[in-house]
């Protein structure tokens, strides 16, 4: 048993040692020497600026990525690496993205491109080999997997809706294998897998309808016909759809001079049977649904190398973001799933817990600040109300004192008049 485990370990180490990493980037301080920002939309001022940052919350402040920093802008940046073919090997594309802005409309996908890419002119029309990653806009949330086959871009037929929309870092992984299968993983968990031929319309149909065949003119495909022996009953069409309500009575206060001649209301006729239609019977001439004969499609050619990309030489982001704030990092292009997993453990996994804790602490602090602000506002409003009530009370007291003073003056006046009168 121990020998078997040792052999398995040696095979793993051997395969790991033979793996090739075509591209890897964690965006150190020298990242701009490897990445080229496109001139796309610079003239019209719609090109967004990328900044080098770990963001507002992180697991490791030294693990920085590139962040979109301006809203409603286009972003296009790329890096090149030695051209390679994935013939006979797995192709693994992996990267992380953190949408600090709580994205509501914007792409966060990555592209693998051919080596001929003109980096300064890189834009939405540039040819690419693979486009992969999340895209969010309103209610639409999906992971794109678009493959270029023979010069045409093909979107995966299945909806991959497992898009993380919180404000933490998430990792997206695409694996394409020589047996023409694929896997999509989010945070190292498989969310989609299948066969390239089944899940993309890369190949034309094996069979097509024979263009030389058409349904015979005498083909009967009507299942039922009217019963020729069924006859419409006499007087059927004479029955009206509505009749005068026999229970209706002219109101006692009805005045024909003022109200006009009274007419009884009508009701649906219970005897009315609607438009007469003959009963249906099975059609004795019915031959069934005509099926168009199929022939082999002359355009179809089997391809056992749907997975193959002969010239991969660049990687890049070409995005439109309504709301900026996405941070991209930890990219790897390799032929080894194990290599990608190891890279993930050292970068993404190692910082997940610490990043979430920092985020939660910041959110808790914000909540506490909001609570204090609300309490302060409530206290200020209560103080204002109390002051208003005190002012109103003072005004009432002042009015009462004024009335009392006026009453006293009136009494003095009356008393003076009385004295004067008595003296007279």
From Swiss-Prot:
Signal peptide stretch: 1-19
Region called Disordered, residue ranges: 370-424
Positions occupied by motif Prevents secretion from ER: 421-424
Keyword Lyase attached: no
Binding site residues for an alpha-D-glucoside: 109, 111, 128, 135, 318
Residue ranges that the Swiss-Prot or TrEMBL entry lists as coiled coil: none
Pfam families: Calreticulin
Stretches the record annotates as 3 X 11 AA approximate repeats: 260-298
KW Cell cycle (keyword) present: no
Stretches with biased composition (Acidic residues): 386-400
Protein name as annotated: Calreticulin
Gene source species: Dictyostelium discoideum (Social amoeba)
Gene from which this protein is expressed: crtA
